[in-house]
Amino acid sequence: MDAKKLKILAVDDDMINLKLLKSMLMKSPNVSAIVEAKNGADAIGILKSQDDIDIILLDILMPVMGGIEMLKVIRADDSLRQLPVIVLTTDETKKGEALECGANGFLMKPIREKDVLSKIAQLTI
């Protein structure tokens, strides 16, 4: 039986980072689609309107609503709390806070393709 193809929500305010992440993810045969959001508020709107997101890749430092705040909203919402979230950041000091707020994984930027694909596989199988 074939593995389910994943629909990933990538949240980052840096369009270059989003483009690089999308390029890495689309190389995987297990990814069907990548939905992009530029901040946590936009991402929450997407999650409320699309119930088929399988995993979230989330930057921490963003305007409007940052990653930690978005994590808190997700984990407080019965319809969203089960979604796996991988936090992506350049600030290693945010790891403890992110995990405490419900992140399922943590990767340091710059992201390596094999690391992000491995972490996604761990959390979605």
Label the model's feature ranges.
Residues E36-G45, G66-G67:
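Helix N-cap/capping motif at the beta->alpha junctions
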Residues G45, I68-R81:
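Short amphipathic alpha-helix used as the core "switch/output" element in two-component signaling
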Residues K5-N17, L21-L25, I56:
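Conserved acidic segment of CheY-like receiver
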Residues K109:
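A Lys-centered signature of the CheY-like receiver
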Residues E69, D91-G105, D115-S118:
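Alpha4 helix (beta4-alpha4-beta5 surface) of REC/receiver domains from two-component response regulators
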Residues M62:
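Receiver (REC) domain active-site loop signature in two-component systems and cognate sites
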Residues D51-L57:
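Active-site beta3 strand of CheY-like receiver
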Residues I86-L88:
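Hydrophobic/aromatic residues positioned on beta-strands within the core alpha/beta folds
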